[in-house]
Design a protein with these regions (language model features):
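A glycine-/small-polar-enriched, mobile loop at the entrance of the PLP active site in fold-type I
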Residues: 36-39, 54-73
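Generic structural signal for well-ordered alpha-helical scaffold segments
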Residues: 23, 77, 81, 107-108
Length: 388
């Protein structure tokens, strides 16, 4: 089969590849602790499940409007005002099956040969993949351990050229766990305002999972709502990964183009999932708060545990549920550490270079697992590292 050349530009998520290797070892009888997948280990809150079940019984089993059911778009707009302090109209909301389609559609709508897109590196690997697929040029914005994985904003203007059309932000950040402060977002906004045709895609999927600060959105800065596409969803905050539901909040001029891309690809998100999402946003938030409280305990457990292992350094994550320790002093590449920790220690984790060139020398561990399993993983990794 002769494939289109553009398929060579499409990357992947190695988390699922590592998961497959781990499952194969488990099938052979090896005990594996899973710290590779970025998925909450909690069930969807019961009132959300009940709303979804009732929606199915009430006949929400048909096509819905491509940009989303009116009741969900209205709920998202209300929630955005409450959480972000941004006056949002339902007409500026587009709902999709998962948040990735919003990323893809935005890059297909704005990216093309000759256009440059700035993105965080280390960062979610699909950013770079989608930028390349759109034909645009990926321009990495390095996140360094020495600054707690925050970008050096004094260098940002030097990355921007006349061809730069989009800057991708992710806060809290995957894989590093850093969270952009209000002051940092103000500085970015001031830089962006100096350029006429420059936009922000703000990935805020982890906005509810924070430990050291409240959530700040760059769209709330003066003059930035019309320059910002917010990307969010329900998978992380409400443990709804399998419900496949995300959304974008965007300038009105972009909505018809993103909607047309959705018409040509997914048609619409599942109607019953959307009714469940209304219950998620407008129902009790106790389960979310309890989940974040538990993640905070695990964050301390894993970061302190990793720092207790010889020659490993791990900055304290500020948000999300990932630790991103340095293994530079161990004499192994990130990929070698990933492979050997799986086979020799029985701990599944991800090589840092899966998140971009600046991730070499690091690994990512998800602490979306029990305290008991995290402690066992630390003990296994400690033994493995001491054996090197």
């Amino acid at each position: 089969m002769t494939l289109a050349n553009r398929m060579m530009n499409l990357g992947t998520e190695t988390a699922f590849e590592v998961l497959a290797k781990a499952r194969a070892l488990e099938a052979q009888g090896q005990d594996i602790i899973h710290l590779e997948i970025g998925e909450p280990d909690f069930g969807t809150p019961q009132h959300i499940v009940d709303a979804g079940v009732n929606a199915l019984r009430d006949g929400y089993t048909h096509y819905g409007p491509t940009p989303g059911l009116p009741e969900l778009r209205e709920a998202i707009a209300r929630n955005s005002q409450l959480v972000r302090g941004i006056k949002t109209e339902p007409e500026n909301v587009v709902v999709t099956p998962g948040a990735k389609p919003i990323m893809f559609y935005v890059l297909l709508a704005l990216g093309e040969p000759g256009v440059e897109v700035i993105y965080p590196n280390p960062g979610f690997p699909i950013y770079e993949s989608m930028i390349k697929f759109s034909g645009a040029v990926p321009v990495p914005m390095q996140l360094q351990e020495e600054t707690g994985y925050h970008p050096d904003l004094d260098l940002l203007p030097s990355l921007i050229t006349n061809n730069t059309r989009l800057i991708i932000l992710n806060s809290p950040e995957n894989p590093c766990g850093s969270n952009l402060s209000h002051a940092e977002l103000e500085k970015i906004a001031n830089i962006v305002r100096q350029h006429q045709n420059l936009y922000i895609m703000s990935d805020e999927i982890y906005k509810d999972i924070l430990y050291t600060d409240s959530h700040n959105s760059i769209a709330a800065m003066p003059g930035m709502s019309e320059r910002t596409i917010i990307l969010d969803g329900f998978s992380k905050s409400y443990a709804m990964t399998g419900w496949r539901l995300g959304y974008g909040i965007m300038p009105s001029e972009l909505v018809p183009h993103i909607t047309r891309l959705a018409v040509n690809s997914v048609s619409c998100a599942a109607s019953f999932s959307q009714i469940a999402a209304v219950a998620a946003l407008e129902g009790p938030q106790d389960d979310v708060e309890a989940m974040v409280t538990e993640f905070a305990i695990r964050r301390t457990l894993i970061s302190e545990g990793l720092r207790s292992i010889p020659n490993i350094n791990c900055p304290e994550p500020e948000g999300a549920f990932y630790a991103f320790p340095s293994i530079k002093n161990l004499g192994l590449t990130s990929s070698e550490f990933e492979d050997r920790s799986l086979r020799e220690a029985g701990v599944a984790l991800l090589a840092g270079n899966a998140f971009g060139e600046f991730g070499e020398g690091y690994v990512r561990l998800s602490y979306a697992n029990s305290q008991e399993n995290i402690q066992k993983a630390i003990e296994r990794l400690d033994k493995f590292v001491r054996s090197l």
